[in-house]
């Protein structure tokens, strides 16, 4: 597999010795289908030939549920599987999250309603090499077409799609290579992954070598894209840190078509930006090399209780006790995912690397004692697995988090001092938010310097003091009224997220699990790093080729009501 990755890299570097012209024409807005500047069918055919026939004219995934393409059998299949990421992963254009799909048709709107493309990309390049990246970048610039980057489309903020856009689709770049890595900062086992690799791919390969890597809780998420570039929390984060903390180097094609290596010693500014500064804006990553670690046994804890046989007061008192004890779990290397509603609590799971069942039981004993003192019935399951992959398949992969969680989203990183000094106010916040029908998911972890050491990257600084990454969500039933959903989205922005912000005014939010309408997103998602990241963006993407919602530099643009991407006046 090394030959596959690096032969492509050498080929593009040779081609770049004689560089074609890059850059956009001097216009305010990107071209859209129907515009006089939109490429003709002949233009598209010529471009397709230049990339070996890899251009795809996209079709809405749900068109089988709408006239004139209606097919009852296909539509029923789509409706049954619509919430499974795998259905969308293999599509070059499907928008997974309903909240950012806008007017793109889905499998549940009326059959008679036209299947509009909405914010779906118009064309997609099934990329097989860095050369495909470079040629697509150049074509998008010459023809003034919006360009986006996509692997699986696992995306709550709409970064991997756009009306009238051309997409670089990396999904079938699946090479994985084991590396004995040596550098001034790290010597040890590592893996180089191509851009289309998904979590399940690398977990299985690593397990086969007796190793683990830091990756997402959802098996379908692609580690190389926005997950790691945005920081990336993991069930192993309290042991090793965030995904961005593991990166040794990147191979990336920038906005001028150059294939670059980005590491602490080569193009270090680009390495720093890609490692936590957000995806889809500095360039198109072809591969990523990350640290790997010896495998270990893992103990998992699943705990649930509800209000069926207890009062709301006692229920939320128990929630308070859980948060009180959470730092003890994370200090022991544990990572906890707790889903809280107004009537239920589900810890699913608490992942404890290299701990025995006895150690796990001892860790949670104080919390269990509080539940019993409150006379709250509970269900507890403690399971030990011989390897991390076994634990993952038993307790993480079967979770509801593996489904497409349609809803309105918001989030906040809550510092450790909130739990230590303001746990009463935190409990009141959880109660107020969940009483409105909002689901509160608290991801408990410790990625402070005591865990990660002296790392050098652009991860949002608020992560280093965070005890909880909170994701809020509301329900989005099939066929939901979009006006009603927009009202809930606005309440997320104006009411529920601000409740958490008041608890942590100097913190921020995990940019991949956030409110798409976050009003102060540069500060909230990037903190003090934003201005430096913006300068790096301009250095490696001088023509503003790459745009993604809430990505660095996206404030220079605005999306019109028809989906057209235009420069904000004064930004040229």
Curated annotation (Swiss-Prot):
Localization per Swiss-Prot or TrEMBL: Vacuole lumen
Q: Name one GO cellular component term.
A: vacuole
S-S bridge residues: none
GO biological process annotation, one example: patulin biosynthetic process
What Pfam families does the entry give? Answer: BBE, FAD_binding_4
- Domain of life here? Eukaryota
Q: Which UniProt keywords apply?
A: FAD, Flavoprotein, Glycoprotein, Oxidoreductase, Signal, Vacuole
Q: In which pathway does it act?
A: Mycotoxin biosynthesis; patulin biosynthesis
What class does this enzyme belong to in the EC scheme? oxidoreductase
The FAD-binding PCMH-type domain is annotated at 115-295
Keyword DNA repair among UniProt keywords: no
The protein's matches in InterPro entries, at most eight in alphabetical order, are given as: BBE (IPR012951), FAD-bd_PCMH (IPR016166), FAD-bd_PCMH-like_sf (IPR036318), FAD-bd_PCMH_sub2 (IPR016169), FAD-linked_Oxidoreductases_BP (IPR050432), Oxid_FAD_bind_N (IPR006094)
- Do you know which Gene3D superfamilies this protein is assigned to? 3.30.465.10
Enzyme Commission (EC) number: 1.-.-.-
Applied biotechnology uses: Patulin was originally used as an antibiotic and specifically trialed to be used against the common cold, but it is no longer used for that purpose since it has been shown to induce immunological, neurological and gastrointestinal effects. Genotoxic effects of patulin with dose-dependent increase in DNA strand breaks in brain, liver and kidneys have been detected in mice. However, more recently, it has been proposed that patulin might also have anti-tumor properties.
Membrane-spanning parts: none
- Signal sequence range: 1-23
Task: List GO molecular-function terms, semicolon-separated.
Answer: FAD binding; oxidoreductase activity
Point out the glycosylated residues in this chain. 48, 71, 126, 180, 309, 354, 381, 422, 446, 481
Q: Which PROSITE patterns does the record match to this protein?
A: FAD_PCMH (PS51387)
Cofactors per UniProt?
Answer: FAD
The task this protein performs is described as: FAD-linked oxidoreductase; part of the gene cluster that mediates the biosynthesis of patulin, an acetate-derived tetraketide mycotoxin produced by several fungal species that shows antimicrobial properties against several bacteria. PatO acts with patJ in the vacuole to convert gentisyl alcohol to isoepoxydon. The pathway begins with the synthesis of 6-methylsalicylic acid by the polyketide synthase (PKS) patK via condensation of acetate and malonate units.
Tell me which family the UniProt entry assigns to this protein.
Belongs to the oxygen-dependent FAD-linked oxidoreductase family.
The protein here is known as FAD-linked oxidoreductase patO
In which organism is this protein found? Aspergillus clavatus (strain ATCC 1007 / CBS 513.65 / DSM 816 / NCTC 3887 / NRRL 1 / QM 1276 / 107)
Q: Which gene encodes it?
A: patO
